[in-house]
Amino acid sequence: LPAPAARQAVLDVLIAPLPDPHREVREMAATTLAGVGRCSQRAHILPLSRTFAALAATPLPRRGAPGFDAALERVHAGVLGAAALVAAFPYDVPDWMPALVLDTLAPHSESPAPVSHTVRQCAAEFRRTHQDTWAEDQLRFGERVQEVHDFTLGRSDYFV
């Protein structure tokens, strides 16, 4: 196994293109990160989830305002990174995942494209990969289980 510094350097290289101005580059970086996340040590996941949550929390100015595009790229980078971590554990709900799903991803379901598109894709994939074990997996979300239902199925108040 590579030394911890080398492992961190690899992760840094994978994270660097997430805020790239080109959407395709961001999406491919997230796909690669999901694959590497699947086989990396779990000790690296929590710091990554914090990094992605901070990026996703970037305030978005109004569309057309100075800095909107750069802020949207940062938010999308955070959402892509968070979605990559969720995708890295398709049949498991680790301790860090409920907060990442509900506090980082779900709030962006109505954000401008391409952020909302990424969130909807992640929600659909999460629902697909967890449907067989949902009776057990939902216990990991505790009192917030309704929020994850809203995330994966769409908010019910939208249809009222």
Could you tell me what each predicted segment is?
Residues 1, 18, 32-40, 56, ...:
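Hydrophobic residues within the alpha-helices of tandem HEAT/HEAT-like
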Residues 3-12, 42-53, 93-102, 138:
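Core helices of alpha-solenoid repeat scaffolds
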Residues 12, 50-53, 76, 80-83, ...:
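Amphipathic, non-transmembrane alpha-helical secondary structure
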Residues 13-27, 36-43, 65-76, 92, ...:
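Short coil/turn segments at helix-helix junctions and helix-capping linkers
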Residues 41-44, 60, 134:
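Short amphipathic alpha-helical interaction/hinge segments
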Residues 53-74, 120-124:
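Acidic, Ser/Thr- and Gly/Pro-rich intrinsically disordered linkers and low-complexity segments
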Residues 116-160:
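Eukaryotic acidic, Ser/Thr-rich intrinsically disordered low-complexity regions
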